[in-house]
Amino acid sequence: MAKAASTLVFPIIFLVMFALIEQNMGCMAVLGSCGVITDCSGSCKTKFGQDASGDCDRDGGQGTCMCGYPCPHDKLHM
């Protein structure tokens, strides 16, 4: 019986850890091409607020403007 209980402890700990990590990561959005959006960081702050950050992900071509911002409280985390 003790062994069965201990095998459930680790999965429960990992589920709780992943739930907490997902809440702290925030939300992400793609605004468009860095060739069109010249100031990615400024555009993200304008659209999502002063706590937002933006970077141009140069994965190919002109790159993609990626925004990171705090998730609204009413958004569900799944």
UniProtKB/Swiss-Prot annotation:
Compartments it resides in: Secreted
GO CC list: extracellular region
Cysteine-cysteine disulfides: C27-C71, C34-C56, C40-C65, C44-C67
Chief place of localization: secreted
N-terminal signal peptide: 1-23
Spans through the membrane: none
Alphabetic keyword roster: Antimicrobial, Disulfide bond, Fungicide, Plant defense, Secreted, Signal
An annotated GO BP: killing of cells of another organism
Family: Belongs to the DEFL family.
Protein's UniProt name: Putative defensin-like protein 170
UniProt gene name: LCR62
